[in-house]
């Protein structure tokens, strides 16, 4: 089956609150139920964060994206999409539970927030990526 989902445009902004917006900078990947984006946001004191944003957007439900970035579902599929969104939220809860398990040292993602916007659900995940250059940051002080 061809993947005809329309991703959020680069530069699209999702408003979390009055002072926190998430800006889409890239598409990172796709799964059967989601599209994952690279994104940035500035926290309440202006510090920039690189994050991943996972959008609940199942390929097999033939959703369409409106100009305002909301997802529309065909008549008769609303309940199925609501069930999928609930399972998406349950996976977030499970990931948080795994992340918080004491003694577990192999966590694959760091889920941080659930966002309900655009008639769908997003999972905000922190991005822990770097290289040996981090030593320079600490030795410079």
Predicted regions and their residues:
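A conserved loop-to-beta-strand element in the N-lobe of protein kinase catalytic cores
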Residues: 117-126, 134-135
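Juxta-kinase regulatory segment immediately upstream of eukaryotic protein kinase catalytic domains
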Residues: 1-19, 23-26
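Short hydrophobic-acidic sequence motifs that mark active-site Asp/Glu residues
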Residues: 50-52, 108, 124
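Short beta-strand micro-motifs within the conserved protein kinase catalytic domain, predominantly
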Residues: 102-121
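AlphaC helix of the protein kinase catalytic domain
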Residues: 133-141
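ATP-binding glycine-rich loop module of kinase domains
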Residues: 41-94
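Protein kinase glycine-rich loop
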Residues: 25-32, 36
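Conserved alphaC helix of the protein kinase catalytic domain
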Residues: 26, 93-100
